[in-house]
Amino acid sequence: MFKKTKITILGATGSIGDSTLAVIRETNDFEVFALTAFSNVEKLAELCQEFKPKFAVVPDLSKKQKLQSLVTDVEVLVGESGLEKVSSLAEIDIVMSAIVGIAGLKPTFAAAKAGKKILLANKESLVTAGHLLIDEVVKNNAQLIPVDSEHNAIFQCIDNHDKKCLPEIDKIILTASGGPFRDKQQLHELTDVTPEQACNHPNWQMGRKISVDSSTMVNKALEVIEAYWLFSVSADKIGVLIHPQSVTHSIVRYVDGSYIAQLGVPDMKTPIANAMYYPKRGSVNVESLDFTKYQLTFREACFERFEALKIVFNNLQNKNYAANIVFNAANEELVAAFLNKKIKYLEIIEVNKKVTKELNFENPKNIEEVFEIDRKTREYVDSVLG
């Protein structure tokens, strides 16, 4: 008898959640076991009515009451304990970790400790605690499969489960669209950028925070950290190229001079389906790539123009993993301030440079220390912003 794969979707109402559910609608291979949301209770209720999960998770009691008033045939859990439960129950086969921000850390760790197949879209799990998460994955025989289009591309280009291939890798090259301001070469051209302009990504449909991160190249800087942990490579073996068409998602250069790249139209259903079905491949409805319609171009990502990259590469080269926690937490606070029109666009990176330079912590030995560094950084940023 055919048994559907049971999946928990952490962050079901976000853009990754949307694409994951789109894949599930197109196939008959998955059963939604649990859905979680932070603020959009109405959308979560609609998804519960459509997919009939056993559990739904919301952050507090007021949202629980609201959800229960909208749907009656789902068990509603609350807060961190609820997230960790639906990430680790024995019935679950796959956990899609798509919560935005450090809030995704604990449920991702819970899934790793339970030995689950984790589809990782939550950057912060690796950015802030990569050394700790990889240890848990290895120790508990879990699987960690990247969902970001760039990392999933690398995952497809190398045999990631055969560590013998890693010495054969000469360079991992992450591609970046460059965001909406990729053709503005001077920072002074960005002085009066508005949140609406920063969120207008030319290639991808994404949430507001990640759209801003793409425009500042912080998103790519965080992906450099992820690649460092996911593929066990040193910082000097990671490169970044601006690729405006977003067709070549990443490239691996081998020591014999061979290059292997993964290409596809910019549609998140492709990497998500790849991760969901791995080690097999499933059929999903995505546009075919017509090579006759594209001219693929690449150029260097200038560290002076995109200073976020410079900060992160310096942190990795010095093995200063705590500084990446500071960088990430400061960025979250500063992007929120920008979206609320409390600071100028260029201050996102300017203030982050100042904060990352002034705050010094030892590398965390456990997840509690990660949260402590994160908390202290946010408090410091708040004091700087007044």
Swiss-Prot record:
GO terms for biological process: isopentenyl diphosphate biosynthetic process, methylerythritol 4-phosphate pathway involved in terpenoid biosynthetic process. Its EC number is 1.1.1.267. NADPH binds at T13, G14, S15, I16, N40, N122, E124, G207. Pfam families: DXP_redisom_C, DXP_reductoisom, DXPR_C. Mn(2+) binds at D148, E150, E223. It is an enzyme of class 1 (oxidoreductase). Belongs to the DXR family. HAMAP family: DXP_reductoisom. Catalyzes the NADPH-dependent rearrangement and reduction of 1-deoxy-D-xylulose-5-phosphate (DXP) to 2-C-methyl-D-erythritol 4-phosphate (MEP). PANTHER family: 1-DEOXY-D-XYLULOSE 5-PHOSPHATE REDUCTOISOMERASE (PTHR30525), 1-DEOXY-D-XYLULOSE 5-PHOSPHATE REDUCTOISOMERASE, CHLOROPLASTIC (PTHR30525:SF0). This is 1-deoxy-D-xylulose 5-phosphate reductoisomerase. It comes from Francisella tularensis subsp. holarctica (strain OSU18).
